[in-house]
Each structure stands twice: as structure tokens, then as C-alpha cells.
């Protein structure tokens, strides 16, 4: 993408961990589109990842912040507005985690302390972020806030575990807070329901590789990549989508509206023939 769709626009990008992450790809795409931004992640994530490389590549300041901590968020927003030279035009929330998934706990045997922690990081942090932005009047009119979701918020994907609940709440927060942000401040709030993507976080989901192949065979256009999601996010940040808000937008090659693909049927027929 070479169009300067975001020239003169300022923002914050949450969640860039490494080059495989969607937030990382989005930062690169926003930079290419002319936008300036602050990169942020939790201090522990900053130590684990390679975000300094991204900061140098995109000329973006890096400000550590725990997205579950309201004091951190307030300080982050204040510093971002100061360093970028004005109110914000876009924010990306690309944060999610489940200790239950990481530890292999089955959905029928969840650890509730872990559930609460994942809930706070993956979903409640989005409300805390928007509340801080709202109270500080930190967004310009016609600004755009985007969070990344997944179809498991609406359909059953057993191995996605309690992350499905987290994403469902995330989408609900986007609609509920998005109403007030739109009505009172003309700020857009949307979620993107992205194809399964082989990110560092996604690798923790059991059976992901098999599901990636299944989704690729099901989606008429194939799975959307992290880079393609980044381009889509740039479009949502741009002025071309000024009247798009409160939406959960499927960016999945058509997977979300296919019952079963002919490729899958043909594959099952072949297995039946082999078995007989």
C-alpha cells in the first residue's frame, strides 16, 4: 500500500509483540500510509518481543503500559498526545490472552482466577482504554478505534476455550461504548473478526494448524493474512469509512458465511472411498 490515506493522522497501536503479530503489520502499514503513532504493550511483553526494531523502522516512540491498569492508560494517553503533537485519530487494540488455553485447561474445568485475568486483559482492557480516551477527550472527531476479534465470539470452536467468551464481551463493549463515543464525540468504534492467523499468541490454541487448513478450504477467497488485516485496519482508520461504526466486520475470505465448502465434501468423499 502506497496511498497516504493516514497522512497527518496520529494514534496509538497496542499489542505489537513480534513481526508475526497483526499489530506489528498494522504499524508498518500505518507508517506507509503516512500516519504517526505511539507503540505500546505491557512491560513483560516488551521484554519478550522485539518491538524496538519496529519503533526504529517506523520512527515510533515506545511507551510501556499495562492495559488493565487505568493509571497506566491515563499516563499513556497523556504522553501520546504530547509526543505526537495533538489529539488522536486512531487506536488499535490488539491484545488477548488466556492462561487456561496456555495451560491446557479444558473448558469444562476452567481455573476461574485465570479466567478473570484473561477476561481483564482481553476484553475489559478495551473498556478501560475507551473510558480513558473518552474522559480525557483525547480523540479527534471522526477518529477510529478498532479492536481485533474472532468468529469464536459467535460460533463454537471448542479449542478456543474461554478466549471465545473474552471475544464475545469485547465485541459487546465495542457496540455499547461505541454508541456513546459516536453520539457525543463522533468517534467510530468497530471490531474486526479476522481469519485464524498464525501469530505467537495464536500458536497456543490446540489444533490451530489443522484449523488453518480447514478454514483455507472453506473460505472462497482463502484465509486473510496478517498483512491483509493490517491493510483493512488502515482503511477503517481512514476518512473513507467515516460512517462505519458499531460493526463487527468479518475479514475472513468469506469463511463466516459458508456452511460447508465443496473442497471439504470432496475430501470426505475421497476418505469414504478409500475406507471402502
Annotate each language-model stretch with its function.
Residues 3-40:
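Canonical Rossmann dinucleotide-binding motif of NAD(H)/NADP(H)-dependent dehydrogenases/reductases
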Residues 13, 92, 146, 189-192, ...:
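Hydrophobic structural elements of the Rossmann-like NAD(P)H-binding subdomain
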Residues 15-25, 96-184, 193-199, 216, ...:
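Catalytic loop of short-chain dehydrogenase/reductase
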Residues 30, 181, 236:
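Aromatic pocket-lining residues of Rossmann-like dinucleotide-binding sites
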Residues 52-53, 184, 191-219, 259-276:
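A glycine/serine/threonine-rich, flexible loop-to-helix segment
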Residues 56-57, 63-74, 78-118, 135, ...:
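Conserved mid-core segment of classical short-chain dehydrogenase/reductases
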Residues 72-75, 117-132, 228, 235, ...:
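Conserved mid-core alpha-helix of short-chain dehydrogenase/reductase
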Residues 124, 191, 209-244, 249-253, ...:
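C-terminal helical subdomain
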